[in-house]
Amino acid sequence: MKQYYPLSNTILSEIKKARNILINIHRNPDLDSIGSATALYQALKKMGKKVTLVCPHQIPENFKFLKGADSVKTIDFKEWADTEVRPYDLFLILDSGSYDIVTGHKEIKLPEIKKIVIDHHKTNNLLDVYIRLIDEKASATAEIIYRLFSDWNFNIDKNIATSLFSGIAGDTVFFKYSKNAKSTFKIALNLLELGADKNKLIDQAFDSFDFNLVKMIGETLTKMKKRDGFVYSIIDNKTYEKYGKPKGARELVADFFARSIKGYNFGIIAFEVEKNVFSLSFRSKKDTDVSQIAKKLGGGGHKNAAGATIYGNIDQVINKIKEII
């Protein structure tokens, strides 16, 4: 049977040869990064492989229902010495378009291990790696992992199905923004047939918001302003800390409000996550490509959903955004 990805067998061969495998979950982990990583983690464990999941940030509590998520090691790549890297002979880099997205630091290179990149971001710039599988037509990296499993004739159990379904649902905002709707819905249906627990996903990830998270969303909406063609909201670090820096607030406002306002083509939500460090989320309607705006600011992503990090005070950030737009 013809394989979906010509690189499938090559990737599987490298996995079979490896003795100790590292899988990343990117900074500010979302459902796709966690879902695709935990699905691959479970699969490789079933193959008898020694596997470690790493992330530069803590995994949100409401995503820990995914099997394997409670095994993630939170590491600081700045302090990750050669001695800690040495045991690993393969690094699977998922859903990460740049080094800083992998490490959480702007100027840190990845450790000297054989690397395989699997991603769906067209702006991916991780070029100095052994294998690159970039499918920008996929709605989520979890969708690529699903197709790899199909190419490998790997049997997906209900826990792996839940991880993959969660990744796809998360990156498409529960199928609202799938790139290839027909294909994505077919995959989602198959995962449900294989036992994916949709109800647990909804209960844990979408219907279990912390009170401070909701308050932070309200504050962000209150500060929203409009300009020609777009809306934006900028939250300073003092306000962010006031509500305990709730994870996911920026992304939720971006996904559900920034691109949904009548008469405006796109939105920008910026949080000062540390002193003079702003994380930006861009969301747009169908015909507006915000990945190009993000790219000019050193970030990247998809046509209708992208991100970037800007360094400076709030006035400098506003000026940088105005210069680009």
Model-derived features with residue positions:
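Glycine-rich, phosphate-binding/catalytic loops in enzymes
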Residues: A39-Y41, I108-P111, L133-I134, K186
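Short alpha-helices
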Residues: I118-I187
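An acidic intrinsically disordered interaction segment
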Residues: M1-N9, I108-K115, E136-I145
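Hydrophobic helix-and-loop "lid/oligomerization" segment in the mid-to-C-terminal part
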Residues: K2-N28, S33-K67, S71, E79-L90, ...
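Active-site cofactor/cluster-binding pocket
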Residues: K73-I131
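Conserved beta-strand scaffold positions in the cores of enzyme catalytic domains, especially
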Residues: K115-V117, R132-L133, F230-Y232, I269
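Short, motif-level signal for alpha-helix interfacial/capping segments enriched in acidic residues
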Residues: Q3-T10, S96-S98, L148-D151
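Short, hinge-like loop/turn segments at secondary-structure boundaries
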Residues: G68-V72, L110, L133-E136, S284
